[in-house]
């Protein structure tokens, strides 16, 4: 469970992957690609959720880890593009961690690939419904997006924001 507590995440990292964050993330992306290839759905959400607890590792070794991570992530984006799937920009963690899933650092590449996006707060608390939305739209605009994909009358449409 990539959304589990750090303790559970760290335990799985050590027990299942011998402490190798790279192996854990490789497996996560392998399964993600398999899901995108074999399932029929419109939206992929939480694409980089694996980094939620991994950020504590990235913070110390960012320069060493990021090149291989970004390469793997780009391979997943290529599959998303080929399959024509919408990517969710999820703001649920914005208040707590000042980040989204997918992370803002990926938006330019997603735009360059022509991957459509939708924005969602994934909110479980009505008081936090709008948390991070304006920041997400701002980041999208900064990275070249002018539209988001919205479901209207049972059909997906690109809507300017």
Language model segments and positions:
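Charged catalytic cores and adjacent phosphate/nucleic-acid-binding surfaces used
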Residues: 57-161
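Extended substrate/RNA-proximal surfaces in nucleic-acid metabolism proteins
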Residues: 1-83
